Amino acid sequence: MMKVDQDYSCSIPPGFRFHPTDEELVGYYLKKKIASQRIDLDVIREIDLYKIEPWDLQERCRIGYEEQTEWYFFSHRDKKYPTGTRTNRATVAGFWKATGRDKAVYLNSKLIGMRKTLVFYRGRAPNGQKSDWIIHEYYSLESHQNSPPQEEGWVVCRAFKKRTTIPTKRRQLWDPNCLFYDDATLLEPLDKRARHNPDFTATPFKQELLSEASHVQDGDFGSMYLQCIDDDQFSQLPQLESPSLPSEITPHSTTFSENSSRKDDMSSEKRITDWRYLDKFVASQFLMSGED
């Protein structure tokens, strides 16, 4: 048997690759097989699918010496019961199970056949273990009046293994080397040192920071910090200089200028007050590093 397989492989020219379409499998190869006509290049073997295991198809259906990922063969449907229409798809090691809906095969807008998908399961139904082996079974819908009745049961098959995808490692959304701490820990060392060390003396500026640290422990740091960042002036760029006004200024424009100047002074004073909180916050960091 091996000698026959070797002679069969040698008859295939080097570099030959067999990749027929669904239409070609049904409209040419299967049609000629049912009609018992000669096929120009006989590269599709006859296999009794239900007397062979799927992993043996690679050697039995090899075409030439090129590496293959698909294997083609003719098979004859074996009825499960003599008077029934159900097909027997059991092998020694398992069984083939149909899955999904059959797909129509058209040639020049004419329905010529259907494609059925089969999956191989190890063991016995209904407790079989699903494998990666899949078969596309093509059967003809055309009438073959001149063909013997026994030839109507031929199908052409494409066997292949389902590609297994390797899961890729998800990117981490955070860097484990970075430290994370909440706002309350920023001033906590300074407050803890004052509570646990009786000899600790704080300057008036440090005492003010300690009082603010107590507010942080009570969850009041957000309101203190938001006083600085919630101001609309904080995110605005400095205003451009306005063009010089005409020499003649009406009393209304003078009043508007005085009001604008007064508002700018109040806004500037508010910005200074807001910045003091941030300055105190930054100063606390230098104090903590100095104490260490």
From Swiss-Prot:
Disruption phenotype: Reduced secondary wall thickening in vessels and collapsed vessel. Keywords: Activator, Cell wall biogenesis/degradation, Developmental protein, DNA-binding, Nucleus, Transcription, Transcription regulation. Residues 237-269 are annotated as: Disordered. Residues 237-259 have a biased composition (Polar residues). It holds the Pfam family NAM. It is found in: Nucleus. Transcription activator that binds to the secondary wall NAC binding element (SNBE), 5'-(T/A)NN(C/T)(T/C/G)TNNNNNNNA(A/C)GN(A/C/T)(A/T)-3', in the promoter of target genes. Involved in xylem formation by promoting the expression of secondary wall-associated transcription factors and of genes involved in secondary wall biosynthesis and programmed cell death, genes driven by the secondary wall NAC binding element (SNBE). Triggers thickening of secondary walls. Interacts with NAC030/VND7. This is NAC domain-containing protein 105.
